[in-house]
Structure formats: C-alpha cells, structure tokens
Amino acid sequence: MGGKQDQDKEAYGKPAKYDPSFRGPIRNRSCTDIICCVLFFLFILGYIAVGILAWVYGDPKQVLYPRNSTGAYCGIGENKEKPYLLYFNIFSCVLNTNIIAIAQNGLKCPTPQVCVSSCPEASWTVEPRQFSQTVEQVFYAANRNFCLPGVPGNMQVLQSLQQELCPSFLLPSTPALGRCFPWTNSTVPELPGISNTSISQSISGLLDSLNARDISVKIFEDFAQSWYWILIALGLALVLSLLFILLLRLVAGPLVFVLIIGVLGVLAYGIYHCWEEYRVLRDKGASISQLGFTTNLSAYRNVQETWLAALIILAVLEGVLLLMLIFLRQRICIAIALLKEASRAVGYIMSTMFYPLVTFALLLVCIAYWAIIALFLATSGQPQYVFWAPNSSLPGCEKVPMNTSCDPMEQVNSSCPGLMCVFQGYQSTGLAQRSLFNLQIYAVLGLFWTINWVLALGQCVLAGAFASFYWAFHKPRDIPTFPLGSAFLRTLRYHTGSLAFGALILTLVQIARVILEYIDHKLRGAQNPLTRCILCCFKCCLWCLEKFIKFLNRNAYIMIAIYGKNFCVSAKNAFMLLMRNIVRVVVLDKVTDLLLFFGKLLVVGGVGVLSFFFFTGRIPSLGKTFENPQLNYYWLPIMVSILGAYLIASGFFSVFGMCVDTLFLCFLEDLERNDGSADRPYYMSKSLLKILGKKNKGTPGDKKRKK
C-alpha cells in the first residue's frame, strides 16, 4: 500500500534533493534558450525595418489634416493660414456617403471642398438678382472667401455656380476634426428632393459621432482646474495600497477569516432569498412546464425551477466552503503565514513596489511604436488624382475621360461644367503597398510578442528579488545589497531567450483568439446555431488554454530566476512541484485572490467615494485652501481618479501577488530539500515552522540564526 502511494507521489517527479551549495538564486549560470534569443533579436530587427519602411512610405498627414478637392492639405504648407475644410454642399456627403469614410479617406464626397481660414458664421444664399454680378462683387468684396483658389474676380456668379467654383449657399458652421459642419439648429435652405428633417438628423448624428469642439474645450478646462486634485487622489491610492500591503503582516489572519465569514454570510443570504422566491412561486404554481422554451431569459425569473436550481448551487458552494474551513484549516493558516511573509519581504525590498513603473514605461513604448507603425503603414502610397464632374451627363462632358489620372497642378481647360482634378486615394503598387497586409500582421505579432516579453521580464525580475529574500538565512543581513537591480541585470544577461520563448507561446495563443474573434465578427450575420456553438466552444477552449499558459509561464519564470535553467526544464519542474502540492496551490491561490480583490476594492472604492464627495462639493467643512474647483463635468476627474487608483492598486498588488507565488514555490522547495537538521535547516519563518509542527534542530549557537 505504501509502495503504491510512493508511486503515485512520484508520478509528478521526484522531490528536490538537498544541495549543500544551494544558497538561493544561482549566480554562476549560463545563457538559456539561445536559439529563441537569436530569433527574438532577429524579429526585433525586422520590426525596426518595418518601422523604417513605414516611415519612408507613410504619410500620416492625410489622417491628421483634411484635404481639399485638389488633394492639398489644410493647415500646412500653402494653406497654413487655412486650417479648416469647407464642403460646398455637405448634404450630399451626409445623405449619400459614409461619414467615417470621409474622415479617413479624404474626398469620397461628391462636392467641391476648399480650405478656409474660418468657418461661416451666418446663413447666406445667392439670390437670383446676383447671378449677373461678378464674383468680386458677391464673394470677395463681402469677405466671403470660400471659392476655389484661382477663380477670377470678373467671372459672372452664374458661371461660377454652374462650374461649381463657388458655393451657392453658406450655413453657420462649427469646426470639428478640421472640417466645417453646420449647426444643428441652423436654417437650412430648400434643396430639391431633400427634406429639412433628414438634413437636420444627418447633421446631428455627424456632430455627435465626431464630437463637438466646445466639449473638448470644456474637458480641457476641467483638467486644467482639477489636475492637482487628481494627482492628490492618485497619491492617496498609492499610500493606501502600500499601507494595505505592509499592514498584512499584522492583520492578514483576522482579515482573511473575516472575508471568508463574509463570503459565507453572502452565500447564506443568497440561499435564504432563493428559498423565499422559490416558495412564493411554488405556491402560485409557476412552473417551467407552463412557460415552455423561450429566448427571453428574463422570463425564467418567474418560474420556481430557476430559483430551486440557484438555491442548490449556492447550497453546494456553502457546503464546500464549510468543508474547506474544517478540513483545510491548516493549509489556510499556511496561506495566511505566506501572505504575512510576503508583506515582510516587500517591506525589506521596497524598491520592488515601484518596478511596475518600469513595466508601464516599457509597455507604453511597445504600444506607441506599434501605433506609429500602423498609422504610417495605413497612409503609405503616392496620391492619385482623377477627373471628376458633379454631372457627367451635361453637354461637353461626354468626351472627358472621367476617373482617369490627371495632374492637379495643371489648369483644367474643358467645356464640361464643374470639371476638376480631385484627389481619389493612394496607389497600391509600391513596395510597402503590395505587402501592406503582411506588414500589418507582422506589426501586430510584434505588438503581442513585445508586450508579453515585457510582462515576462517584470515577473522574472521580481521573482529573483523575492527569492533572494526567502533563501537569506539571516534576514535582512543575508539579503543582497541590490536584489532588484541584480535580478534585472541577471535576467537580461542570461534569460532573454527563455522569456522570449514563453512570450512567443502565449502570443501564438492570443493571436489565435484574435483570429477567432475576427471570424466570429465576420460571420455573425450568417451564423446558424450550430456554427455559433462551435465558435463558442473554440473560444472557450482558447481562453482556458491562455489562462493555463499564463499560470505555467509565471511559475516557470520563478524557477528560471532561482535556478537559471531553460524555459522547458523550468516549466516542467514548476509544474511537477505544484502538482505534488496541488491542494496547497488551490487554497493559496483562492485565499490570495480573495485578499487582493478586497484590497483593490478598498483602495478604488475609498478613492472613488472621496473624489465624488469632493468634486461634487459635498464636503462643506473644507477651507478655501481645499475648496473644490468649479467644473463643467464633475464626473470626469472622478472617473480619472478611479481609473488611476485601479491602475496603481493593480500595479502594487501584482508585485505582492508575484511575491506570494515566489515565496510559495520557495517554501515547497524548502520542505523537499531540507529536514530541519543542523546541516539542512529550514529557511522558512518561525510562524510557518510552528504551523507545520517543525523546527530547526541546530546547535545552541545556531538557534539564534532565525529571527
């Protein structure tokens, strides 16, 4: 029987053997996963080459600045003093074309467009009596400089309107994204075949989608008045996060048990509520047999079987949690002791709490570089210009080859009314354009791989620092002078390839999830129930696989930081070690998740409540020094404060979570390597020794080594 148990235990590998030379993270190590390291550096060089190629061929000005009918940019170059784009007849845009396409691709709108210094401020329409007058009299003399460039002042107004050289009407407009859009309450002239209601609705939707300029100004004003209060709120979140982690060594035990009792209480109330609902519906005779099958999920709330099923589920959860408290209380105590030890480790190595700033900065670099590449690639190519006329069926237009190439710098001489050489788009025949899709895929792959590598670097560095704390017998005397800096340099020097290997595996799974989401989005309209079910199963499987790989990678990086082995060996050793202690793993993971969730709730909720009462003026006792600013949108600084508090709390608690995981693996290794004798003493704290009923049996002089 005992032999069978030993075989079952060794199914996940043999326990770690005692090594007299082991004193924590190994210093004499060699480079690991060199092939993957070389592959990663070659990929980065290719990523840089893609960036250079995008910079050479790309032109982001077409996204940042609007274009007129000839393809010239507004706001730069010869149009530097004319930053806004005016549409002669914007209703032909909002009623016949895609507005988002207009914003992204330039013209794509059947009306002339001209760069202007300011948008029209009043309504105006050409009157019939002005047809015989000149452009100088009607437009230029009245300071209506809205005609196309080069229109002579002695041209008759009727001729300029027929050739679409000048606008026939103007509306009071507001600039948005560099374009002049009419006010929603402006008086619209009568246009044949178009109702004023449809025009007003189109303008209103257009302004809503592009956002009005005055809202942006108000938001900027709110930030200008409240930025220092937002910084104070973020500072408060930082202090609360740090205090919560440092105080865990004092209150971790009571806090964990209070949280567990709270969860038990919530489940008990849920059972009571479900029973009451079930009893009422049972007395009414409301059964699922009367309802039948329906896609209206809210209807199931009114049948007794729904509440009975919920009652059974909650009762099972309540029973499982009670059994865990009864039979796994020692392991819960071990988890609490490890949480206290993690708080102690963070207190000794305070620099680790600010390492998330390094990770955040590196992530910003990765995301910004990809965004710039994507922008330049999307705007690569030489501009194309073609002949265009508002009505190609008019006399004189039959012989004009519409949609053929032309030069916008040359004068258009034709009897076709309104014929112009306009910007159509960008060529797709260049080097970058032929491979545009492949380059974009390469850039996306680079984004995922570099982000995952940066996150892996942070995990491995923190693991190395905290492992040096655990394996220091005399704490804090034996802790290295710069544990975080040493771990950072050691990781970069020896284990870049291993981090790239783990990041690549995770990246491939994430790319597969993105492809699956893209397929689901494209086929959403034509899916049948079977297809949706299959896609849902695939997405669920990939989600589970990604979670498992993240868990495995995290523990593999801890083993890499300690022993300096390659990724595969480290992942195998970590997995085997965890499987040999699977119950402890589950208990510690859930206790830590519960505690960190409560910590985030405390920090984010506290900052959010204080921000709400302050920015809404509900703290009247504050003096003038701490007077709340008068804001247009008081919710804006509140939301920014809450978001910033969440990011800060997540950064701090991610460090704490990594500390707990590292100390846990070290604790398991300590149990397998050592036996408490003078030659093989335990490195764990006295509280852990006491919980396990173990002690170090050293000589009298050695008993003082543990603090």
Swiss-Prot record:
**Signal peptide positions (record):** none
Any stretches that span the bilayer, and where are they? 34-54, 228-248, 251-271, 308-328, 357-377, 453-473, 499-519, 558-578, 595-615, 636-656
* Annotated function: Choline transporter that plays a role in the choline-acetylcholine system and is required to the efferent innervation of hair cells in the olivocochlear bundle for the maintenance of physiological function of outer hair cells and the protection of hair cells from acoustic injury. Also described as a thiamine pyrophosphate transporter in colon, may mediate the absorption of microbiota-generated thiamine pyrophosphate and contribute to host thiamine (vitamin B1) homeostasis.
Name this protein carries in UniProt: Choline transporter-like protein 4
Q: How is it modified after translation?
A: N-glycosylated; N-glycosylation of Asn-68 and Asn-391 is required for a proper thiamine pyrophosphate uptake.
Q: Out of the domains of life, which is the source?
A: Eukaryota
Q: Which reaction does it catalyse?
A: choline(out) + n H(+)(in) = choline(in) + n H(+)(out); thiamine diphosphate(out) = thiamine diphosphate(in)
Provide a Gene Ontology MF annotation, just one. thiamine pyrophosphate transmembrane transporter activity
**Highest classification ranks of the organism:** Eukaryota, Metazoa, Chordata, Craniata, Vertebrata
